[in-house]
Regions:
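Interaction-mediating elements
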Residues: 21-145
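Bacterial Sec-dependent N-terminal signal peptides
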Residues: 1-23, 39
Length: 145
């Protein structure tokens, strides 16, 4: 039993080290073209503080952090998966029209601080008034906190 516990601990430590090794800083021009275009189009007025690639066994993702603290996460193809704009707001033209219309009708004037896209679930949205909304793939509200 002790050997099994030791083996589990060793594997855990090795996996943590492997994860740390697979996160590496990169230049924005080393990211997929779709991510570069997205940044140039929607965040042209912001300065990039750091970009990194996170490589895992079956997945690769990219993170960009701007000097004001805003952050974008991209999948391996360069499609955004999470936009976190705690210090500004998510650009309106990146929000799906159905979600944008819902927010305009029900939360007019409230900033959208974060939007996360999950291909299986839909979208999670955090508003400046503390409300969190979850939309399914058909853009219907399925949860609210």
């Amino acid at each position: 039993m002790k050997k099994l516990a030791l083996l589990v601990v060793v594997m855990f430590v090795v996996s943590l080290n492997a994860k740390a090794i697979n996160d590496k800083p990169i230049m924005v021009n080393e990211m997929p073209q779709a991510a570069q275009t997205f940044i140039q189009t929607h965040f042209a007025n912001q300065s990039v503080a750091m970009a990194k690639v996170e490589s895992e066994i079956f997945n690769k993702s990219y993170d960009v952090i701007f000097t004001n603290g805003d952050k974008i996460e991209f999948d391996k193809k360069g499609n955004w998966t999470n936009i976190d704009c705690e210090h500004t707001q998510v650009p309106l033209n990146v929000i799906p029209a159905e979600i944008r219309n819902f927010l305009n009708q029900n939360y007019s004037g409230v900033k959208l601080l974060q939007i996360e896209k999950n291909d299986r679930k839909g979208y999670d949205v955090d508003l400046g008034n503390g409300i969190e909304l979850e939309f399914d793939k058909r853009f219907r509200v399925v949860d609210m906190d």
